[in-house]
A protein has these predicted regions:
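Structural signature of eukaryotic scaffold interfaces centered on beta-propeller domains
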Residues: 58-67, 97-113, 150-168, 205-220, ...
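A short beta-strand motif characteristic of beta-propeller blades
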Residues: 43-52, 87-97, 136-148, 192-204, ...
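Conserved beta-propeller blade signature
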Residues: 24-28, 68-71, 114-117, 167, ...
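Short loop/turn segments that connect beta-strands within beta-propeller blades
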Residues: 39-42, 82-86, 128-132, 187-190, ...
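Gram-negative bacterial Sec-dependent N-terminal signal peptides
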Residues: 1-22
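An edge-strand/N-cap motif at the start of beta-rich repeat modules
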Residues: 21-39
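Loop/turn residues immediately N-terminal
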Residues: 31-35, 75-79, 121-124, 178-181, ...
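Blade-level signature of beta-propeller repeat domains, shared across WD40, Kelch, NHL, RCC1
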Residues: 237, 242-267
Length: 268
């Protein structure tokens, strides 16, 4: 997701060459408010409350299989959301959902076409959004060989790589608010976590309220992005290091984000 057309010199070097094609990002805040961020202007182009949902939206993501934006609410109801109007249409009702009051991670596995739901309490679910069937996978825990072995995970965001239709392989990365770092969850179904590295966010930013997504070009290239406060950061998937890229006007309290499919196969 090389998404900004104009950056500081250091950020431009980091993010690489830009193209003429902007990308839109859906950013979730409050209970069910979506802001559409235009990556060309670096501003919010429209903001609306999701129309037709009952309850707090846990998280959002684009499903690679159909390129539609999905939202999951607290009672487990799954909706598709029209990004032009904000109108929600019920898709299914999950037979099990996350523990009330926990921070939620919602992201589609592009290979299995299943929705991963993770709670900050360690609950780890895998859902078929077509029929609502849910598999309870292994509770999150750090690997026996990890430096954080025995500690309680506090995952507040996560995303899969290669998030495109027809992907043959993928990997799941999480953000842990307690250690302020990037984790790799492998295998995702087992819930086994391995620390990649510290994000190194500014101390003024609240790592408990962040949004995280990974852009993929369909050719094996992945770029991870994290929103904290009103700053978008690039995240190195090899080291966990988060680097401020640009400040976004008109957003605050963003707790989930989804990179929307654009007219071109590849954003900037």
């Amino acid at each position: 997701m090389k998404i900004w057309t104009t950056l500081t010199a250091s950020a431009a070097v980091l993010l690489g060459a830009v193209s003429a094609q902007a990308v839109e990002v859906a950013a979730l805040s409050g209970d069910n408010t979506i802001s559409i961020v235009n990556t060309d202007t670096k501003k919010v182009t429209k903001t609306w409350k999701i129309d037709g949902v009952s309850g707090r939206v846990l998280g959002i993501d684009v499903r690679p299989a159909d390129s539609m934006l999905y939202a999951v609410v607290t009672d487990g109801t799954v909706y598709t959301v029209d990004t032009a109007t904000g109108k929600a249409t019920m898709k299914s009702k999950l037979e099990k959902t996350l523990t009330a009051g926990t921070a939620a991670t919602v992201d589609f596995n592009p290979v299995a076409d299943r929705l991963r739901l993770i709670g900050s309490d360690g609950m780890n679910l895998r859902a078929n959004v077509d029929d609502g069937k849910v598999t309870v996978d292994g509770t999150l825990k750090f690997a026996e060989t990890d430096m954080h072995k025995g500690e309680k995970p506090n995952v507040v965001a996560g995303a899969y790589t290669n998030s495109v239709k027809g992907a043959k392989e993928t990997a799941l990365y999480d953000i842990d608010a307690t250690i302020g770092g990037l984790l790799k969850q492998a295998p995702p179904n087992d819930g086994v976590l391995g620390a990649v590295g510290k994000l190194g966010l500014d101390a003024k930013l609240d790592v408990k309220i962040v949004a995280f997504d990974i852009w993929s070009d369909g050719q094996g290239k992945n770029e991870a992005w994290l929103m904290a406060g009103d700053w978008l950061h690039s995240v190195d998937l090899a080291t966990g290091k988060a680097t401020p890229a640009v400040q976004i006007n008109g957003v605050s309290g963003i707790r989930d984000m989804a990179i929307l499919p654009g007219p071109a196969a590849k954003p900037m």
